[in-house]
Amino acid sequence: MSEVKQCDVVVIGAGHNGLTTGAYLARAGAKVLVVERRHETGGALVTEEFSGFRFNLHATYMMMLDVAPPYKDLGLEADGCVYIRPDVAASILKKDGTAVTLHGDLEKSVESIRRISPRDAERFREIYLEYKQMSDEYLIPATYGKPVGSAQLAGTYMETELGKKILEVSELTPYQICQSWGFETPELGALLLYLICMWGIDPTETNSSYLVPLYFNRMLNATLVRGGSHRLSSTLQKAGILAGMEVMENHEVKRIIMEDGAAVGVEVAPTGTDGPLIRIDAKSIVTSTDPTTTFGTFISEEEMQQRSKLCLNTARNWEWEHSSLFLCHLGLRKKPRFKAEDQDPAVQTAFIRVFGVESPEDVVKHFNEVMEGHLLHDIGHVTFTTDLDPNQAPQETEPGSAVARIEAVVPYAPAQGDWADVAGPYGDRLIAKLAEYMVDFDPADIIRRYQYTPVYIEMKIPQMKRGSFKHGAYVMTQMGYSRPNVQCSSNKTPIKGLYVCGASTFPGGMITFGGGYNAAKTVAQDMGLNIWWTEPDEVIAAREKGLLL
């Protein structure tokens, strides 16, 4: 052991949750050290530059950034993190050269739908307002509060009309919910179901159906980070460092040091090596890693048998996502036009354009095929990040250039072969399919192309096993109060001094800040630190209505 460090709090992992916890606790007066195995912080907030084109390899659609407490609490906008809200949220492209388009503004969406079906327009308004209420009054506030057990939650739901509505939704599959909307325009249902399920939500399972209203609402209000997604993690890190937080990059945790049944520190070494080892003693250890790593690698099986057999079983039986993502990033000399722009000019700037499906049944069929390991149909969506932020392409050297981000839900291990062999041909298929909806696409306009496969996801970020993008499947035993298990979902573990804050903890994955935000408060309370931030008004209001504890 060549070196010993002392601090109040060690945070394992500098993804957005780890940085959030670290920044809050540093401002609360704690001496915080964040340990990150990679050469940069941010986790899934990855932006890499290729020939002047900025490709957001992972997290791109910020569903919750504008409502997440850390954005204001930590002053992220002032430090350079600015989100851009698109006017046109999404379009679904049809084979006949037309489209169905939805806007961030409700009335614009209603008018857009009215041109196709007046009945669907009014039905959409009803659903939108109902789901907005569910999101604003419960689902968003619940993200930044303590989880509630399922039995207690059901009882709480039954005490309010809003709760009853959420309970009704949660008992249906996403596809059944889509059917209940009763749209006579199948493409409208397909677009909404796709936007909900593109995050790996199985349209035929009820495990996470309570999230349908939230995803419906937030995907129509998703934002883009100006300059690239990594700007968000950079400002999070800056907020922490300005408060005294230290970040140790290129170092990986070898083990959590246990003494008398308590976590008292960590042992780290330069990434990819066995030493020299550094011991970091701390009063609290907060880990953003998944349960298999926290309870299966960092702590010995013998120790876990004594401290928590439940956590050991969680590590052994953790279920990873049943699907992953494939991305084909294109740096283009110019942006092509879509055929549907002639019928609906709004398609030109739609944040997300879905292609390859035209009915909810098409969406279900595609997801079923993916779950079985097949890549039979060319289905996905495309975003031109340069529509909102032209500087994500090298405008000085290539005026008018554009970045296209093609994304598809895929199996981790396709039946067609290894991703090393499949990626190129599959990317070709997606590009060719997308070109069917365009007027003037020319492959010669592709200056740079980069494909990001499920295997690459796992290689870049080992915590994302099997191409995971939520740190674990959304199944009943890994949701809500049970994420990662009933002993740890409130961030505190059965091991004294050890806390969890990552995407495998309540409320789950995506860039919500929920795990990191909630953990910061739990640790601050236990350590007697100054809780300098105030609880969001929405959380207080939800509690007063009996929707939260």
UniProtKB/Swiss-Prot annotation:
Annotated GO CC locations: cytoplasm
Function: Involved in the degradation of the cyclic monoterpene limonene. Catalyzes the oxidation of limonene at the primary methyl group, forming perillyl alcohol. Hydroxylates the R- and S-enantiomers to their respective enantiomeric form of perillyl alcohol at a similar rate. Native CtmAB oxidizes a wide range of monocyclic monoterpenes containing the allylic methyl group motif (1-methyl-cyclohex-1-ene). Can also catalyze the reverse reaction, the reduction of perillyl alcohol to limonene, but with lower efficiency. Cannot use molecular oxygen as an electron acceptor.
Entry GO MF terms: oxidoreductase activity
Identification of the protein by name: Limonene dehydrogenase subunit B
Main location, first listed in the record: cytoplasm
Induction summary: By the monoterpene alpha-phellandrene, but not by acetate.
Cofactor(s), names only, from the UniProt record: FAD
Matching Pfam families: NAD_binding_8 (PF13450)
Family to which the UniProt record says this protein belongs: Belongs to the carotenoid/retinoid oxidoreductase family.
Pathway: Terpene metabolism; monoterpene degradation
Enzyme class: oxidoreductase
Quaternary state and interactors: Heterodimer composed of CtmA and CtmB.
Dependence of activity on temperature: Optimum temperature is 40 degrees Celsius.
Keywords: Cytoplasm, FAD, Flavoprotein, Oxidoreductase
pH-related activity note: Optimum pH is 7.5-8.0.
Phenotypic effect of disruption: Mutant cannot not grow aerobically or anaerobically on limonene, but it can grow on perillyl alcohol or on acetate.
Lineage: Bacteria, Pseudomonadati, Pseudomonadota, Betaproteobacteria, Burkholderiales
Catalytic activity field: (4S)-limonene + A + H2O = (4S)-perillyl alcohol + AH2; (4R)-limonene + A + H2O = (4R)-perillyl alcohol + AH2
Annotated source species: Castellaniella defragrans (strain DSM 12143 / CCUG 39792 / 65Phen) (Alcaligenes defragrans)
EC number(s) recorded for this UniProt protein: 1.17.99.8
Cell location: Cytoplasm
Activity regulation (UniProt): The presence of molecular oxygen causes a 40% reduction in specific activity.
InterPro entries on file: FAD/NAD-bd_sf
